[in-house]
Amino acid sequence: MMPVRHQVLLRLLFACALPLLTAPGHAAAQFELEKVVELSRHGIRPPTPGNREAIDAATQRSWPQWTTHDGELTGHGYAAVVNKGREEGLRFRQLGLLTAGCPANGEIYVRASPLQRTRATAQALVDGAFPGCGVAIHHVSGDADPLFQTEKFAATQTDPAHQLAAVKEKAGDLALRRQALAPVIQLLKNAVCVPGKPCPAFDQPWQVEQSKSGKTSISGLSVMANMVETLRLGWSENLPLSQLAWGNITRSSQITALLPLLTENYDLSNDVFYTAQKRGSILLNAMLEGVKEGATPDVRWLLLVAHDTNIAMVRTLMDFSWQLPGYSRGNIPPGSSLVLERWRDTHSGKRYLRLYFQAQSLDDLRRLQIPDSQHPLLRQEWRQPGCQTTAVGTLCPYQAALTTLGRHIDPHSAPEVDMVLP
């Protein structure tokens, strides 16, 4: 028989070990990550040629040229996305989704918008997650993918009259909207205009306008949003301070203060429900179908790399918004992503969905900070009644989550698309 003092010691050891059995690591083992569908924005780029022309004209001065061609992923942007891809690869391996080393068949499929900045971002993500493995990046042969360039396909085009009416209805009194943002507009004017010289964009009223192609925008606001986006990208790129608003911006908090203009522009463009439903249903439908068991391609990680406009329309249909530290409501930073995860409870066999948006902070992007425990990716989760907080995040009952997230999909604007490209 065991001596009494040994029995007492054993009880003490068991009592000390008991908290370990209920620690998050043990709880996490209850849940198995089965599938990830991720929609990422491209990384840091200079202004597109069209944006540069517009902001030059609106401020009557030439904005700084970057070392990269306008609209293309920069070297700094590539490095920042590699950092994010490395963190995701590490996390997915720790959770058992991926195996060590290069991916085996059935682990990952990558589809990118055909533009250079999205293809290069996709390459950076897999170079980070699977260094040296040469993971294939798939994209259409032309310049229009039905998932991403939806304005170029009949089934997903908006009706100009309906779109104009929808934007006008949501915009309401634009003079009041402009007045509410007057302090932010003044900050932007102080940063980008030459004192005492014409700066046309800041003198005109905001008005709804529609191009011959049917694209609807808010004149005045849209070009201000382009300026703010260019400044945000420049900060994230680690441009010299002399090239950021001609030395007028020296802190990330100054960028943060300008971002409400981007939110306002999203609200009156891609976040307009009619626009999002016509042009975003096809992508949201593909994502929700892709997270299901037995979907094609039958891989553990389906990675889609596109544009902030795509993410904006999808999140509008999901009725999911966020506000990450240092960013305005609904902001979509370079390299950020919307992520769907399918989990299984190994005890009950029940399945769950987890949905979140993630990005790096303005300063972490600028200094190429590798995400770690001290500098984690910023994340905000989606939830609805019935979701539960677990050691692996907010998990929502599978079928109920699929139903809620897909309830605004317009079936007429969501024709089936082969995810696997020839």
Residue ranges and their predicted role:
Residues 29-109, 113-302, 308-422:
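Signature for phosphate-centric chemistry
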Residues 19, 23, 419-422:
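An exposure/low-complexity boundary signal
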Residues 2-13:
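Bacterial N-terminal signal peptides that target proteins for export
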Residues 23-29:
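Sec/Tat signal peptide C-region and signal peptidase I cleavage site
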Residues 11-21:
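Bacterial N-terminal signal peptides
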